[in-house]
């Protein structure tokens, strides 16, 4: 093995070997275990959320593969309709063209070309993460098999009356000119205004005051609503007001939706441009007056004054407010904070828009999906997310599935010259079914399906449905879905509905919901904040200048660049070092506590990189002491020392902890157990203890220790493999032959199982005693500032009979690891000398101080340290007592200062105690 651990030297080589050898494919006769990857956008690149989620899935897949399950991790990508189309449209815009200049067929061909040349970025990056997906089965949501499934589902749902075309209110992006899903709308609080407007009563007896954040929409008002129990207005219900600027009379209606306490208690109702107003409009059969075209400009309607025709909505707002003010109909204008919905792709304000769209009737599909979770056929982890699921499902609305773009699954519906609609799997089927010969022209619907429609079929369409292929029977239902909370409704619920409808069973047994990956301060990562980390940069490293350039390019708000550059230079003065994939994966696992958002700190990755180094160096030590030597496989007698029996026993405990944690999706606890065993027990203790046996034991003991060194290392590599696949494979291929294991890959080895026969409570008790004595001596050495290499005389007193047995048996271990000059028991009744003392139960461990330290020099040194801390403490206490600091500083900074104060206080107390001990000598 190389002297230094270099992850890049091994990662790419091993991944290519695994993939070329077909090791990711399902094998064996074990129980099926299947995970469907949430298909990433084919045009996208890996972000921290992907990297975290894919690590969790790969840990599960590798774990179950080694458990002997017939394991499939289904690979695939999503066509990502709007996102992909926008990329290609931007390319066309760069040469002064639009998609309409090319025409539909040529544009779609252009998108396919771009997908083939540029669409493999994210799958290459998944490989860099070590993701053991079965690439031989990779699917794409627009490939022919999945497209056939989409058409089949659409036709069946339409024939059952569960898909229909109708005019309803949708989220409309006026730049893209298409409906968008709620998930593609980002609502953030912004500063705006609240306009209070007077609507005159039609009988001239006065006016009502309504408040709105969107005065331009008053051109489409069709009512004023009041609460039916509001004494101020109850007598006006059924009367009319005259809508300013238009002259239309609109009714005053009573509806319990109105909050009498908000504003004047009167609400303008614009059913065609507000979702709440739409519901009121439906309840009261109000007219739906659309005032905007697809680009959010005022329509040239006869009931809207011509001066507003063609104006952009914000130009119309200014003119409407001006005209109302001129008429004395503005009561007041207030500053107001409001939630503004913007398209996540374009950044423009999304408009509630009344338009003809295709819808799925969701109610009949939701009932069985709710029941499946209630009956426990699907379990959410953590359980509390089932409440979110129920909340959405009980309030489900019909699903708008049509999009006014070109890239996607075209809706399988055709129209004749009279506007009659025919739905079928193909135009040929439609003509045959309805007796329409070639002389009757048919026009296919221009719209495509919402990307989530094909994604909802992912668990069974990827396995060959509607054909009944063997893999469909084997792997459906899948085992677990790993996903974020933000798409429980958009994807999870819809997969459940479609799976139950078309497969007659749930699509997965469990849903593991993970949190968001945030930065070290708990802030959401976003390009505008300049705090985005690229997982590939953490693997490969990136220079400061390249990182600054990366973070400041392509900003929607270029003025943020200077601030982002300043922060980046402050946070990463040396850029980001290369950590390697295994360190990043182990970091993600150690942070994967169920249901919580993840605070991602590079210090954690650095710690995990150090963990990889520790494992690498431990393996080098083991190989240097075992390769070419007798490790017990030749039949020679083996005698197992106390450290051998102890580490074997501790390994059984570690296996039990990791296995239990994996069953509970507590990857953080599994990673913690691995870390503690490898670092604290195997490396820090056992390897040091083994040196003593190898140097002084008899041949049978040395043989037993060599066997244990190699055997435990081989087993812990298998235990750690799902988390750290590359380094474990590299080391395992060298170590495995020493244990008699010969195989092409660790991936196909069995996962360790705890062996009760190797549990040795007696060895653990004795080793705990040995470790306490050693630590006690080391603690005194540190407190008294005694050189680590200086051998110390140790006396023991007041111990039990068991202490005497253990000290006699483990004397060589104590002398070597505690660096003792001598180890003796005081005779019964013999007075204890002036000494520093460590207590181990009843046992007193004494280090006589006479002649070991310069008492006066040590007291002088301690006084200086105490004085330094005495000056530092009041300054820090004052800072934490400053209300201004506490209110303005980020919570993470405050907590850091509190922790520093606690450390200083503990350090001062320790120094004072040490001074008192030395003064007493």
UniProtKB/Swiss-Prot annotation:
Record's keyword terms, sorted: Aminoacyl-tRNA synthetase, ATP-binding, Coiled coil, Cytoplasm, Ligase, Nucleotide-binding, Protein biosynthesis
Motif 'KMSKS' region per record, residues: 524-528
Metal-binding in keyword set: no
Catalytic activity entry: tRNA(Val) + L-valine + ATP = L-valyl-tRNA(Val) + AMP + diphosphate
EC number: 6.1.1.9
Positions of short motif 'HIGH' region: 40-50
An annotated Gene Ontology molecular function: ATP binding
InterPro entries for the chain: aa-tRNA-synth_I_CS, aa-tRNA-synth_Ia, Anticodon_Ia_Val, M/V/L/I-tRNA-synth_anticd-bd, Rossmann-like_a/b/a_fold, tRNA-bd_arm, tRNAsynth_Ia_anticodon-bd, Val-tRNA_synth_C_sf
Major localization class: cytoplasm
Intracellular or extracellular location(s): Cytoplasm
Domain of life of the organism encoding this protein: Bacteria
Keyword Repressor (UniProt): no
GO biological process terms, semicolon-separated: valyl-tRNA aminoacylation
Coiled coil: 849-920
One Pfam family of this chain: tRNA-synt_1
GO cellular component: cytosol
Positions with a binding annotation for ATP: 527
Description of how the protein assembles with itself and partners: Monomer.
Domain notes: ValRS has two distinct active sites: one for aminoacylation and one for editing. The misactivated threonine is translocated from the active site to the editing site.
Function, in words: Catalyzes the attachment of valine to tRNA(Val). As ValRS can inadvertently accommodate and process structurally similar amino acids such as threonine, to avoid such errors, it has a 'posttransfer' editing activity that hydrolyzes mischarged Thr-tRNA(Val) in a tRNA-dependent manner.
UniProt record similarity statement: Belongs to the class-I aminoacyl-tRNA synthetase family. ValS type 1 subfamily.
Protein name: Valine--tRNA ligase
Organism per entry: Methylococcus capsulatus (strain ATCC 33009 / NCIMB 11132 / Bath)
Source taxonomy: Bacteria, Pseudomonadati, Pseudomonadota, Gammaproteobacteria, Methylococcales
């Amino acid at each position: 093995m190389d002297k230094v651990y270099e992850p890049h030297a091994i990662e790419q080589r091993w991944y290519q070997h695994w993939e070329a050898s077909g090791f990711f494919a399902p094998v064996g006769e074990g129980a099926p275990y299947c995970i469907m990857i949430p298909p990433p956008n084919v045009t996208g690149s890996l972000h921290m959320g992907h990297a975290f989620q894919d690590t969790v899935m790969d840990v599960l897949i590798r774990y179950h593969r080694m458990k002997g399950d017939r394991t499939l991790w289904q690979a695939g990508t999503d066509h990502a309709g709007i996102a992909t189309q926008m990329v290609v449209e931007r390319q066309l815009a760069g040469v002064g063209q639009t998609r309409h200049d090319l025409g539909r067929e040529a544009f779609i061909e252009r998108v396919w070309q771009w997908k083939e040349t540029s669409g493999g970025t994210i799958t290459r990056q998944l490989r860099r993460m070590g993701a053991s997906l079965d690439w031989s089965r990779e699917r794409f949501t627009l490939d022919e098999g999945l497209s056939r499934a989409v058409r089949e589902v659409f036709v069946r749902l339409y024939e059952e009356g569960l898909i229909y075309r109708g005019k309803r209110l949708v989220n409309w992006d006026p730049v893209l000119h298409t409906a968008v899903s709620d998930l593609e709308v980002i609502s953030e609080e912004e500063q705006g205004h609240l306009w209070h407007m007077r609507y005159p009563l039609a009988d001239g007896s006065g006016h009502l005051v309504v408040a709105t954040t969107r005065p331009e929409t008053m051109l489409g008002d069709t009512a004023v609503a009041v609460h039916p129990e509001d004494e101020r207005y109850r007598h006006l219900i059924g009367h009319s007001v005259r809508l300013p600027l238009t002259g239309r009379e609109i009714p005053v209606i009573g509806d319990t939706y109105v909050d009498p306490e908000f504003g004047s208690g009167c609400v303008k109702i614009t059913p065609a441009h507000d979702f709440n107003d739409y519901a009121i409009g439906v309840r009261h059969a109000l007219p739906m007056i659309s005032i905007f075209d697809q680009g959010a400009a005022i329509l040239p309607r006869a009931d809207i004054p011509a001066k507003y025709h063609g104006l952009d909505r914000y130009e119309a707002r200014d003119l409407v407010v001006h005209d109302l003010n001129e008429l004395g109909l503005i009561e007041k204008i207030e500053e107001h904070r409001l939630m503004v919905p913007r398209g996540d792709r374009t950044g423009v304000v999304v408009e509630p828009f009344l338009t003809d769209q295709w819808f799925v009737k969701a109610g009949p599909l939701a009932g069985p999906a709710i029941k499946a979770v209630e009956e426990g056929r699907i379990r959410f982890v953590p359980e509390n997310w089932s409440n979110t699921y129920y909340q959405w499902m009980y309030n489900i609305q019909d699903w708008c599935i049509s999009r006014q773009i070109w890239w996607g699954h075209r809706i399988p519906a055709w129209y004749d010259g009279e506007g009659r609609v025919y739905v079928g799997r193909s135009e040929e089927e439609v003509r045959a079914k309805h007796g329409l010969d070639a002389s009757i022209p048919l026009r296919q619907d221009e719209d495509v399906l919402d990307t989530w429609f094909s994604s909802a079929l992912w668990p069974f369409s990827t396995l060959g449905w509607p054909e009944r292929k063997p893999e469909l029977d084997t792997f459906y239902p899948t085992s677990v879905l790993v996903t974020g909370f933000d798409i429980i409704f958009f994807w999870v619920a819809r997969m459940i509905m479609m799976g139950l409808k078309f497969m007659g069973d749930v699509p997965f047994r469990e849903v593991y919901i993970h949190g968001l990956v945030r930065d070290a301060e708990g802030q959401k990562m976003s390009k505008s904040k300049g705090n985005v980390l690229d997982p590939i940069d953490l693997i490969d490293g990136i220079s400061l200048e390249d990182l600054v350039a990366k973070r400041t390019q392509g900003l929607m708000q270029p003025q943020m660049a200077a601030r982002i550059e300043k922060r980046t230079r402050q946070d990463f003065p040396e850029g980001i070092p290369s950590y390697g994939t295994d360190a990043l994966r182990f970091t993600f696992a150690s942070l994967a506590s169920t249901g919580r958002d993840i605070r991602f700190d590079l210090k954690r990755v650095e710690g995990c990189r150090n963990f990889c180094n520790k494992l690498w160096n431990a393996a080098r030590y083991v190989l240097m002491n075992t390769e070419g030597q007798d490790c017990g496989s030749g039949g020679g007698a083996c005698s197992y020392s106390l450290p051998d029996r102890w580490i074997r026993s501790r390994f059984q405990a570690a296996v039990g902890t990791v296995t239990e944690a994996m069953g509970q999706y507590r990857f953080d606890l599994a990673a913690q157990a691995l870390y503690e065993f490898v670092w604290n027990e195997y490396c820090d203790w056992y390897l040091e203890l083994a040196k003593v046996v190898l140097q002084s034991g008899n041949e049978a003991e040395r043989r037993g220790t060599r066997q244990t060194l190699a055997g435990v290392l081989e087993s812990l590599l298998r235990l750690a493999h799902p988390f750290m696949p590359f380094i474990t494979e590299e080391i395992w291929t060298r170590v495995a032959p020493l244990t008699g294991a010969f195989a092409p890959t660790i991936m196909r080895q069995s996962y360790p199982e705890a062996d009760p026969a190797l549990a040795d409570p007696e060895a653990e008790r004795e080793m705990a005693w040995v470790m306490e004595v050693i630590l006690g001596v080391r603690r005194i050495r540190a407190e008294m500032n005694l050189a680590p290499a200086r051998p110390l005389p140790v006396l023991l007193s007041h111990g039990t009979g068991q202490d005497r047995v253990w000290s006699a048996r483990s004397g060589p271990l104590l002398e070597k690891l505690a660096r003792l000059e001598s180890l003796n028991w005081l005779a019964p009744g013999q007075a204890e000398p002036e000494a520093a003392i460590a207590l181990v139960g009843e046992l007193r461990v004494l280090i006589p101080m006479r002649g070991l330290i310069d008492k006066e020099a040590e007291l002088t040194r301690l006084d200086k340290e105490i004085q330094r801390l005495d000056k530092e403490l009041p300054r820090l206490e004052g800072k934490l007592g400053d209300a201004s600091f506490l209110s303005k500083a980020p919570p993470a900074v405050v907590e850091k200062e509190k922790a520093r104060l606690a450390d200083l206080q503990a350090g001062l107390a320790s120094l004072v105690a040490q001074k008192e001990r030395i003064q007493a000598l």
